[in-house]
Amino acid sequence: MVSAEILKSFSLFSGLAQPELAEIAKLCRERAYERHSLIFTIGGSATDVYLLETGKVDIQIEFKIHDYEMVATVYTVGRGEIFGWSALVPPHRLTASARCEGKADVIMMNGKELMEFLEKDKRIGYVIMKNLSALISSRLASTTIALRHEIQKLIKK
């Protein structure tokens, strides 16, 4: 069972009190993934938010420029970080794929259930969505840098 203490270590929940985290913990379930497991695929329906407890998960996108196709890792999620945030943001479509580098343990929350909970407590909802917007901004910056790097490699070929 996921504890409030574990959730406290994730930046998504920064600013929440122990009793609030305990309520959110009730929405959580745990899952283990094997090395190289594909957790989700770009373009799919985003139903769950993932919190990484152990391991590393590569966030990848596929792209094609003329006849050149490739899969680029645009971010590597580390312990204590979240991914699959599209489950909380319309249109709830996955903007990338997620693949485990090695074994990984994750905490999962159904996005719809979490949003229903956040609707009931506007303060908690505000705190989490504020933290989420900072995360999305950071990931967008990381993705831009990673794509520039991949395009530069392509141009040099």
Locations of regions flagged by a protein language model:
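Cytosolic regulatory regions built on CNB/CRP/Popeye-like sensor folds
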Residues: 1-157
